Regions:
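Short catalytic helix/loop segments, enriched in acidic residues and glycine
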Residues: 21-42
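Short beta-strand/loop segments at the ligand-binding rim of alpha/beta enzyme cores
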Residues: 2, 67, 72-81, 95-96, ...
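Active-site/ligand-binding-proximal alpha/beta "capping" segment
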Residues: 139-179
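Charged helix-capping and loop-helix junction motifs
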Residues: 63-68, 129-138, 160-168
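Glycine-rich phosphate-binding active-site loops on the catalytic face of alpha/beta enzymes
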Residues: 83-109, 152-157, 182-216
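N-terminal active-site wall of soluble small-molecule enzyme domains
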Residues: 38-94, 164-166
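Surface-exposed amphipathic alpha-helices with a cationic face
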Residues: 68-75, 109-110, 167-173, 194, ...
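Conserved anion-binding
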Residues: 3-26, 88-156
Length: 224
């Protein structure tokens, strides 16, 4: 199972995301990196795989495209959610894998080719449609994505942990490559995700609190 380092960008800084309450996000300068500078942050931690959410572009207030491309040069793969709104609204660059999120991607996901679909979930429902996440993943079987990410926004930054029964339903609903992010708190949660059959775990807070070893993020894999 891949281990992917998550980080959010806002106002040219890496910020600590929590529950999707973006107005309150603060610079992440207390964890494994002494700097919240986007490129410096990646150089300090040296992950193999990186997930970036460009909050300014998702909200339509700015862009970190230059910083993202620089960060992508430093990793094997950089999964990027920058608020894609149409098939021609993708970022082209070395090592970049575009993410199309349900929050901004519109209602017709059949028009996209390639990239990853992020099933953005708040309060157990896909946003903005309000659909059941497992049902939505079943629909994604018919679309032309490389894989899917189940992003539990309500749990981001909380270390609430994962629910094995819910994870099993999600995994059973989609046969393709499937990552999970949001609330992963420790090695036990990673074991649950791996045993359930998830292909990747996107983590941040657990790493910065020391619950997951930094060298695991640097090698990019978890083996239970």
């Amino acid at each position: 199972m891949k281990l992917v380092l998550a980080r959010d960008l806002r106002h040219n800084l890496v910020v600590h995301g929590q529950k999707g309450e973006r107005a309150g996000y603060k610079p992440l300068d207390w964890g494994c990196s002494p700097t919240a500078d986007p490129v410096g942050f990646v150089k300090e931690i040296a992950p193999k795989f990186l997930y970036i959410a460009d909050l300014d572009r998702i909200e339509g207030t700015g862009s970190h495209d230059t910083e993202i491309c620089s960060c992508a040069q430093l990793v094997e793969a950089c999964y990027v959610d920058r608020g894609c709104r149409a098939p021609d609204d993708l970022l082209i660059g070395k090592n970049i894998k575009n993410i199309i999120g349900t929050e901004t991607g519109g209602s017709d996901f059949g028009r996209y080719r390639g990239g990853f679909l992020s099933v953005d979930v708040k309060e157990s429902r896909v946003i903005p449609s309000g659909e059941n996440p497992a049902d939505f993943l079943s629909l994604a079987e018919e679309w032309d994505f490389e894989g899917c990410i189940l992003l539990n926004i309500s749990s981001v930054g909380t270390e609430y942990g994962v629910n094995p029964a819910v994870l099993q339903k999600l995994r059973s609903a989609y046969s393709g490559e499937l990552f999970y992010g949001g609330g992963v708190r420790n090695v036990k949660d990673l074991e649950i995700l791996c045993k359930t059959g998830f292909d990747g775990a996107i983590i941040a807070t657990a790493l910065h609190h020391g619950a997951v070893p930094i060298d695991w993020i640097q090698r990019g894999t978890f083996c239970s």
